[in-house]
Amino acid sequence: MIYVTIPLKYIPRQLTWEMVIKNIEIVDKGNTYDTRTFCRESITGFKPAAYNEIFVINALKRFNESTAFMQKDDMQELYSSYSIRKKSGGYRRIDNPCSDLKQAQNRLKDIFEDFFLARYHTCAYAYIPKRNIVMCRQKHAANHSKWFLYTDFSNFFGSITYEYVIKMLSQIFPFNSILANPTGNAELKKALKLCFLNGGLPQGSPISPMLTNLIMIPIDYQINKYVCQNFKRASYTRYADDICISSIDGFDYKEVISHINEILKSEGAPFGFNDKKTHYMNNNWKNFNLGIMINKDGNMTIGWRKKKELKTLLHSFIMSHDDSNKCIWELRDVQYLQGIIAYYKQIEPQGIANIIDLYNKKFHCNIQWQIKQALKI
């Protein structure tokens, strides 16, 4: 089967493959974050005007010629590695490519996005322009879901091998077409070798997130199809390795896990579920995921702990002004407060506005104006 994912300026309610073939102009590379994926045995007749196979192969040739000096048996010397502490405990290894390699990986990423029309399944939300955590959670809130299954994949980036990426790309247009061309096959495979470290995708590389979203298209498609066909008003999202499936009615989550495992097995996926992070609950409990809670009323909220922390920050900021109403906070601290307020307003606009209004009245001040003044310094 071949998977074709197209970005659209608009998505007709009943978009069919026949409509795509007859009206190829609806395939657009404009400013949009919605996509539609089709799974077909044959894609005869599908020839987007923006795609030119010879042009793409030549671009890969030029890329490989200019980066030949970085093709090494031991890629580790082109990376600096360090570890950061995870909130859940333990450490996450970060492999940061050197400037030349990072520049090369960004160039290859641009080739994939510009020439290959590389896209993501519409249920993916991480590392995608115009998509974010808030939109990911909003999809479930807008669905008025009551029951939620949360899980994630273990060692997601590190387990994705070079061989697995090639295998999955052979199912995805237009990579399948390039791989079917002898010259294109050699050039694409050579270029992709610059993206791997110690047998997996390094966290810290600018191209790793895009590659994971790309190769997950067949899996995302199958999971979403299963969820939508088998549960009443259900919703599926994936944020990197974090999975959420929700519905207005309860469901047998073990059956869902079992079916998804079958999908992963059929695709030869080298990763699987993290049982310790698999939870099934309704929204009467602490329904937190990705730092955002969906409460019993179906509304998104930052939760009382973060509200308490915000109030502490606001109080500290107000008290930091001297007699001349000048803020003595460091610039970076003011920027942090401004960013926190902006982010929280995306999640819970009215609730955050109420907190700020409360403190403005309580301390006879204008917090937003004070922040703007502090940032001018």
What are these regions, as identified by a protein language model?
Residues 1-85, 91-205, 209-210, 214-228, ...:
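Right-hand nucleic-acid polymerase module
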